[in-house]
């Protein structure tokens, strides 16, 4: 219920931004200026790219969704899948914009019905993500959405989940790409699209 309420608020917020803020998707928008960098968080040496400041800017958020939709509309997507948790934010707004079903990819133990799961590596140990078994149909062309591409481990696991259910990964999209972490190499067989790169700055 909490997730449903959150997604409703996100979509309503997007509706408001769409109505009140004209945003030409062809216009170049400097997203870097809307993303805060927090040094040494969550541990020393890490430059954390904080998208909460982007989300507080309705024009920037609207621009992101327009760019994603413009890129993927010609690709005959049938479903949008958002990765917990920030992928839900962009995935919900994009699903609304493209008039497509939204599928949630969640951490282990968060989905109530029958699921399939996929393990992926962490810095120390492993974790799992899950998807409802009935969320993807054979042949579905699925666009997977997350906020940021780092090492690519979570997105790779999400792609595996879609493929376990005989879906087709039609694309993987992100707001932020961190090229120095080489996530694109792990996902090179897929169509990748991101809006802004942070290369160690």
For the regions a language model picked out, list residue spans one by one.
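Active-site-facing substrate-recognition patch
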Residues: 20-77
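Short, hinge-like loop/turn segments at secondary-structure boundaries
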Residues: 98-99, 119-123, 187-191
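Short Gly/Thr/Asp-enriched flexible loops that form oxyanion-binding sites at enzyme active sites
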Residues: 89-98, 159
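Conserved G/P- and acidic residue-centered "switch" motifs that form tight phosphate/ATP-binding loops
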Residues: 147, 152
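Short glycine-rich phosphate-binding loop at a beta-alpha junction
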Residues: 77-84
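Short, amphipathic alpha-helical "lid/cap" segments that border enzyme active or binding sites
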Residues: 3-8, 65-69
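Short, glycine/charge-rich flexible loops or terminal/linker lids adjacent to PRPP-binding catalytic cores
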Residues: 103-143
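PRPP-dependent phosphoribosyltransferase catalytic core
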Residues: 7-34, 156-201
